[in-house]
Amino acid sequence: MRIFLLGLAACLSTLTWAAPVEQNPEAIKAQLQDYYFDAARRGDVPMLETFIESGYSLDTRDSKGYTALILAAYHGQAPAVERLLAAGADACAQDQRGNTALMGAIFKGELQIARRLMATDCSPDQRNGAGQTAAMYAGLFKRLELLDALKAKGADLNAEDPLGNSAVRLASGEIRTAAPR
C-alpha cells in the first residue's frame, strides 16, 4: 500500500509540475507595481533601469497616488530621482493630496533632490489639495536656501493658502491654523 501511495504521489506531483500555471493578469500587474515602487523607495537604479528599458509606464501610481519619482524623492534616493527624470518621469505629478516630489523632498530635508526637482519645468507655485506650495513647505521647515531658490525661479512667496499662511509668514514662524470648533 505504501508503494502505491508513493507512486500515486509521484504521478500527481509530475502532473502538477507539468500543468500550465494560470496567471491572473491583475495579480501580475499588482506585483510588478510593487517591485517598481519598492525599487524607487530603495534607490535600486538597476531594477528601475529594467522597468525603463521594458517601456513600463514611469508615472504609474499606487493607491495613494504616489509615483516612483515621488517615492524616490521622499526616501532620499538621488540617483533614482535622476534616472527617473532622465527617462521622462513627470516631475509635476501630484499624489492624491496634491503633493509633488518637490514638496516631499523639502518636507524630508532632501535638499540636493529638491534642488534637482526645482530645475524641472514645473510651476514653482503649484499647489497641493490644501492650497500649499513648495515655497510654503520651505518656509515652514526653515529651508531658507530653497526658499531663495524658489523665489529666483519665480515663486510667489506672498501667495496664501486658505488659512492665510504664506511662505514669508511661515518662514518667520507665524503659522495660522483653523479655529477650534
Language model features by range: what are they?
Residues 38-43, 71-77, 104-110, 137-143, ...:
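Ankyrin repeat A-helix N-terminal signature
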Residues 17-54, 63-66:
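Intrinsically disordered, low-complexity regulatory segments in ankyrin-centric signaling systems
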Residues 18-36, 120, 152-181:
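Ankyrin-repeat-protein effector appendages
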Residues 44-52, 77-85, 110-118, 143-151, ...:
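Ankyrin repeat structural motif
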Residues 71-74, 78-82, 86, 92-120:
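Alpha-helical adaptor scaffolds
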